[in-house]
Amino acid sequence: NLNIEMKIPEGMDKAHISDYLEKMYYGNVQLFNEHKNQIVKYDAVLIDEIQDYHRSWMEIIKNFFRDPQGDYVLFGDVKQNIYGQPTLQKDVVTNVRSVNELKYCFRSDFKVRDLAQSFQKNVFGDKYDTDDFSENGSYDFFGQQQQKEGYINYMYLQDKDHIRSLYNIIRGNILNKAGNISPNDITILGFTTGLFRTFDAYYRYACREKTNSMLETIETMYMSNLNYIGKNNDKNPNTGWFNNITEHLKKKLFIKRTTLYDTDIIKLRQHIAILFTIYDLFVSYPENFRERLIEECDKCGISIDALIAFRKHYEEILTQFKKEVYNSNYKSIRDNKKLHFWMNSGTIKISTINSFKGWESE
């Protein structure tokens, strides 16, 4: 720890803070050179996921944190270069002279491996060298080719509503126990966060089972914004409807309380977040979630007609509020979820491709 105090200029746009810190601190070679005598040096430096590193970070680590006679070893996979770092001859550009290529993959004997390899050849064939599974020992002692576990099934979703179709396929496999599939064996991958957030809510409220999602839940999104309104109630455009529903639920949920404790406020806002989440589902799928919304309204001591009337009365401002909720940045929540990922949660896993670590679907 060099005890370097980082200062961000007042009024700087949040969108520019990351670039500013990179230029002035994280990637500032001169800054580390000025403090080089204070830096502890190591006999060996091993770096994993080198494709995520800026070149300046590599230079800083190699020149200031490694003993001049020490080892410097980098591990990386150009196919995971999701931040678009520079590449040369289908590989990540680093500050080492030679590369020892690990040509073979020994991670999987499942049939999903074939899908991954086919995807590499067809989509990334001109950009990357594809993984070679030829040395994975695919033959038994009698010279017969082994059958890989699992199966690949392609389905054309005719229904434009992919969320409902996806749910019906997955629940059908679970309920019919196709291939002895349990929720814990299922991982759903895609690239659209908006679709996955809605699917996650659809799944949980339709079948009343939990999920293990690497994305923020819609309830968490609403809760984050409700807390912000609660702390910034003065001159907030959402004050009217926020105070209205807060006071109403306060009377229904905490009948004998004149003052709410912090835990009570959290519980009340959680009810609002859940109500708003199920209401969003109800608007898109009225035949599927009307009864579920009525059930949640009963928990809050209100009728579904009263909730619908409330939403209608504040329709314009609540429509704008919903846009803000769905378009806000929740990266910190996603990072925290990835950090605390647990594979054997007993539930289905939901993740975007760039947050998917390896072969957890096995």
Residue ranges and their predicted role:
Residues 3, 44, 51-320, 327, ...:
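Conserved helicase motor core of SF1/SF2 NTP-dependent helicases
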Residues 4-43, 49, 53-60, 348-355:
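Conserved RecA-like ASCE ATPase "motif II neighborhood" in helicase/translocase motors
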